[in-house]
């Protein structure tokens, strides 16, 4: 949810509110959505403009949890679910902001846009590490806090909500993901670091990293750390800072029951900050004249000072007296909900982990004496606070424009308050899992279903996540809308379940009440959010029993929406593909038939990407930096290249071993030699990075090429959602082994002007591995049977045009050479050639010429 301005406020006063901490041998509750977004931001950088490099992101997640395992940290990952009704206004605002970024995107932009499959790839990596993971029904904040209180362990996140929760909180910005080693000392001295304050340089580093918004600067394991000398016992730990609510509620400042009101006054996703403008104007006076602080920072100081002199009841009464009547109930319900969440003991995650994981809780710590005496350590915070305020740098002197911008946002949001107040309050239920049937929770908790399914069930809405796409085209998810509509129909036509009256019905047809889906997406060509209602087109083709779903629903989607694909033949030939590729290639065929913007070069690029990622990254260590790759494997590359050059000089042609020829082409891929992978990776490694030309001429970057790939991602996402709802009749695609946005774009660019794509792949992209080339041909030939007739072109028109240009260029060059040769020729050359060599020549000016001997 987020409390506006509180993260920056704490970071600027890190010496007061944060304490150094050694993280090891403990449980750790992790905010999965927050961690995934911050890891992706640090790993990919500017490459988010190409639609997602899932391979790099997956490896970063795995490395992160390997570091935790080295320090004997038992993590528990909780993922967010759907949106609550009261947060839709904020969701719409964020969606509009993202649309404006997409409209102006260029590959050099520093803004990170999260790809569609980010959370699914993160969950795959977490599962592969053996870490317990669960998806909550709605936002995971309360569940995170409840689980952390039960286990008496910290929460790892980067969300200002946890500054007001009654939990131990480790801001992700303070975590150094580098394993450190320390000697075990006596118990008293080992606890000294937790009790001391941050040094000035440490606090300054926290502020610097907060401003740079950098979370993980480099993940390092013990392989890079020096071992300690001697035989004394050691332990490994991660350096970080920890926060407890007692640091903010020190003696003489706030009491815990005032924290929910404090957070509401600052503004969050559920209540507009401008709702309190009358209160700030009349009840609290000016927020100070200091130009060193942002407006929100001044507001926090004033609120803290004012709440110090008030009780929780009197403060709430004074705030309510300055609100409009139609806003009072909303604030009271929000404060009450926050108070209940502050000490909530209802924890579904604890029960789920205990039931589904063996030895789920090896670390459950009792409350220590140090935590009970935190109030004593924080009693001097008021004195330190004044010292820090006097010594603040003038590093925010340029914040006048930001203050004006905040004021403008307050004015704009004030216009929306009347609409928000008229919507009515959402029905508050203490246990929100009661809003959903048990079969749905059984599929949701293991994170098998995407979070959007909660919105489909609860709100009957779908908030489309716009991708990097061509702005003048319709949104990339439009080609997958029939699949989404079918999923919505299944969720609301469950066998043996009482059908409740829909929240929203379509009354266009007299006498019928058909539930419809509200679809939120970007409007065409303008920076705005488009709402439109999408009724269920028709009932599912087969009954839907959630406990034993019918796999034929997948076939029904193709029969209805890709009739030219010969569905019977398509599904009968799926057995010829590896199990992990079947759903992926179903998505490819659907995309080829539904998309107007894809061509066969997109298909070639997709197949090349999966062949390379699925083979090379599994066989040899994954390395994307060219210099590092050559440094690590340069000797191997040189030796193998020498062997192959010698064989080529002797006329020996490398082939496939006879034993492998007996296997099918897909089965041979498990036997690809490492030497093939090293040489192929060396050749293809530059294509995993953004082209240098984009740094000078970013207008050469083509969003039309990206748009077709974005449509494909949407098809995979929706088809995989349907597959998970049907209990996985086909294996879910592992996007980290299939899709790399930068590589796909570069492959398309390389193949764009090739008259014979297969020849170019064989001789220039995969010449070092016959097995990989055969697999590429095998997959393309499998798809060729189902390519729509209107896309079957023997020669791509772009390539044909390029070939014609080359021919004309050669003809012009030949004509120029002829003209040049004629221009410099000797005019008497013909006379010399035609002269009779028998006729002697006598030079009259040379008296000795007649003496010439014959």
From Swiss-Prot:
Expressed in the proliferative tissues of embryos and in the mitotically active tissue anterior to the morphogenetic furrow in eye imaginal disks. Keywords: Developmental protein. Residues 388-427 have a biased composition (Acidic residues). The keyword Zinc does not apply. GO terms for biological process: compound eye morphogenesis; compound eye photoreceptor fate commitment; imaginal disc-derived wing morphogenesis; imaginal disc-derived wing vein morphogenesis; larval somatic muscle development. Residues 375-387 have a biased composition (Basic and acidic residues). CDD domains: PIN_asteroid-like. Residues 368-427 are annotated as: Disordered. May function in EGF receptor signaling. May play a role in compound eye morphogenesis. Belongs to the asteroid family. This is Protein asteroid. It comes from Drosophila melanogaster. The gene is ast.
